[in-house]
């Protein structure tokens, strides 16, 4: 059975006051790296990190080492993502994986190797992270969100990143998990439930842009998913208790193709550097005025 999690986990630690919430967003997750660098340079460090999908990757690195140097390390990780084999390879290779699996296009092995290479030696379990950390995945068997707050770190992150159709479901214990964005894409409510009073939301820019009516067949599902993910975030924001302060950090605007289809491109890593720089400048300016 997968290790369970609720808001009472790690009760021996003091309640967090400052949380970093890192949302999902595929290749657009590079924006979060610029935001992290701006936060850490401003002397803002988290007592709690929660993440979804690509935000689970960025969040794990900063929870392992909440320093400017870690943000710079993340920038290096993003610079190498296009060459890492995570979402690369020939069409023939993808078709071979799809033919064998009948469910997905890519192996999760390159992503596992990348995570293991960028996490500190000896940090194998979530409990070993210096900063309390949780990431979310969607349980197939229970059709519900599942929060990982202890157990093998890389397995939890892989579960949170298992994009349907691209990567295989990840088995942890007796359950199988898919991408956390299916259940909770920007988990502000989780951070608040765990006690955070100041929340910094690191998002990839989607919620800054209005949705448009789909005009092509493949845009229909994308728009439907965006409505679902934004509705959950809007509900969390509407339900904030008194005394909780939330900072929605700016992404600096879109880089590359705009529109719903452009936002959901998962292999567009070539623009990572520009996305990091824009988000860094925008967030640094926001923090200076806050």
Annotated model-derived regions:
Residues 1-52, 60-290:
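Patatin-like phospholipase
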């Amino acid at each position: 059975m997968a290790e369970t999690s609720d808001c009472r986990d790690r009760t021996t630690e003091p309640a967090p006051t400052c949380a970093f919430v890192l949302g999902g967003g595929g290749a657009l997750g590079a924006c979060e790296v610029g935001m992290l660098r701006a936060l850490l340079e401003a002397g803002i460090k988290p007592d709690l990190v929660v993440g979804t999908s690509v935000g689970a990757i960025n969040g794990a690195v900063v929870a392992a080492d909440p320093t400017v140097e870690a943000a710079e390390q993340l920038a290096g990780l993003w610079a190498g993502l296009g060459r890492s084999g995570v979402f690369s390879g020939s069409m023939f290779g993808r078709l071979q994986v799809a033919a064998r699996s009948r469910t997905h296009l890519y192996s999760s092995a390159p992503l596992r190797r990348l995570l293991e290479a960028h996490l500190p030696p000896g940090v194998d379990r979530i409990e070993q992270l210096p900063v309390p950390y949780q990431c979310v995945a969607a349980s197939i068997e229970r059709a519900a969100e599942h929060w990982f707050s202890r157990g093998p770190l890389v397995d939890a992150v892989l579960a949170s990143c298992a994009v349907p159709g691209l990567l295989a479901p990840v088995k942890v214990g007796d359950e199988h998990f898919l991408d956390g964005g299916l259940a909770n894409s920007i988990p502000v409510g989780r951070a608040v439930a765990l006690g955070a009073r100041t929340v910094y939301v690191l998002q990839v820019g989607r919620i800054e842009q209005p949705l448009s009516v789909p005009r092509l067949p493949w845009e229909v599902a994308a728009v439907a998913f965006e409505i679902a993910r934004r509705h959950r975030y809007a509900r969390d924001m509407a339900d904030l208790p008194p005394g909780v302060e939330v900072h929605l950090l700016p992404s600096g605007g879109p880089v590359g193709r705009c529109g719903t289809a452009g936002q959901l491109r998962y292999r567009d890593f070539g623009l990572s550097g520009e996305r990091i720089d824009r988000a860094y400048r925008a967030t640094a300016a926001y923090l200076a005025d806050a």
